[in-house]
UniProtKB/Swiss-Prot annotation:
Protein name according to UniProt: L-amino-acid oxidase Bfon20
Keywords: Antibiotic, Antimicrobial, Apoptosis, Cytolysis, Disulfide bond, FAD, Flavoprotein, Glycoprotein, Hemolysis, Hemostasis impairing toxin, Oxidoreductase, Secreted, Toxin
Biological source species: Bothrops fonsecai (Fonseca's lancehead)
GO cellular component: extracellular region
Native organism taxonomy: Eukaryota, Metazoa, Chordata, Craniata, Vertebrata
A GO MF term: toxin activity
Catalysed reaction equations from the record: an L-alpha-amino acid + O2 + H2O = a 2-oxocarboxylate + H2O2 + NH4(+)
Family per record: Belongs to the flavin monoamine oxidase family. FIG1 subfamily.
């Protein structure tokens, strides 16, 4: 998962 991807960032609960 790419943390720079806004969609993936949505699913990321941890920083």
């Amino acid at each position: 998962a790419d943390p720079r991807n806004p969609l993936e960032e949505c699913f990321r609960e941890t920083d």
